[in-house]
Design a protein with these regions (language model features):
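Active-site-proximal specificity loops/subdomain of glycosyltransferases
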Residues: 13-72, 86
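Short, hydrophobic beta-strand segments that form beta-sheet elements in well-ordered domains
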Residues: 9-15, 99-102
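Generic structural signal for small/hydrophobic residues in well-ordered secondary structure
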Residues: 79-80, 120
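Short, acidic, metal-binding catalytic loop of nucleotide-sugar glycosyltransferases
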Residues: 1-8, 28-30
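Catalytic core and acceptor-binding pocket of nucleotide-sugar-dependent glycosyltransferases
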Residues: 109-268
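Short, conserved loop/helix-junction motifs that constitute active-site signature segments
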Residues: 2-5, 66-70, 91-95, 119
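Conserved donor-nucleotide/metal-binding helix-loop-beta segment in metal-dependent transferases, i.e.
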Residues: 81-111
């Protein structure tokens, strides 16, 4: 939550057991008391036990027409996802899209994994009012994002945009630090010794050099395929992710800390 815009109000939905577990955190209770976070239960006639049940849940019209109202945006943030506070990107950059998630096809024009995704509630309502997903068919993210991409008024993020949002197994463009130093140490004016950047989010030569040449999405999604080699598969890549996005340690099993970025299976 600390990586999301401060004016966002969030809702956590879960079973009675999961809501109780989350509410044991003092930090969570503080957010609830401040009105930043709302804890609520998944309706008793719905389930998230397994991929098919999740797909049914997330393609149920009443979820969007009633339960999520008055929200216009749904950020799906599953337990194998993480948003990186160090990223130069932020969630506000993607608010104009009806769907954005880690792309299945970097050159594609629609679609992205739903495990870490941002979705338009009103556009999903339009889809579900006109069509119903058949049980045991395509996963909800494939089913919904395809139909959102077919809407004449829809705007689904393409592969290149989606790669800046979330990294799963496809790799986006590397970061570049300008060769021009932004540190003014001339001593000739009142700005001596100050840092200046051309645009918010610009990297500073001499400070951000460690980010040169690395892919740094806003967040990461592990997914059912595990930690893919294209993102995590070398010791160098893992060391950089640990420095760039230490929050990512929270989506790995704790015993991985000994090996990432350690020497066990350095490449895969």
């Amino acid at each position: 939550m600390y990586s999301l815009p401060p004016d966002w109000r969030l809702r956590f939905m879960g079973s009675e057991a999961s809501v109780a577990a989350v509410n044991r955190s003092a930090a969570i209770r503080e957010h609830v008391g401040a009105g930043k976070l709302d804890l609520t239960y998944i309706p008793s006639n719905m389930s998230t036990n397994g991929q098919e049940m999740i797909s049914r849940f997330l393609t149920t019209l009443s979820l969007y027409e009633t339960i999520l109202q008055p929200a216009e945006l749904l950020l799906v943030f599953q337990t194998d996802s993480m948003i990186c506070a160090n990223s130069k990107h932020n969630i506000d950059e993607y608010l104009g899209y009806n769907w954005v998630g880690a792309p299945w096809d970097p050159a594609g024009t629609w679609g992205g994994n739903g495990g870490l995704s941002l979705r338009s509630v009103s556009h999903i309502i339009d889809v579900l009012r006109s069509e119903r997903r058949q049980d045991d068919s395509d996963p909800e993210d494939v089913w919904l994002s395809y139909r959102l991409g077919q809407q004449p008024h829809g705007r689904v993020a393409n592969g290149s945009v989606s790669l800046t949002f979330s990294g799963e197994y496809n790799v986006g463009l590397p970061e570049h630090v300008s060769n021009v130093s932004n540190f003014n140490d001339s001593g000739n004016d009142s700005n001596s010794g100050s840092l200046s950047v051309s645009h918010p989010g610009d990297f500073v030569k001499g400070i951000d050099d460690w980010r040169e040449g690395y892919y740094e999405p806003m967040g990461y999604h592990i997914g059912s395929g595990g930690a893919h080699g294209s993102i995590w598969g070398t010791k160098e890549k893992r060391e950089h992710i640990w420095q760039y996005c230490p929050e990512a340690k929270m989506i790995h099993k704790m015993d991985m800390a000994e090996f990432v970025p350690g020497n066990c299976g350095q490449e895969w």
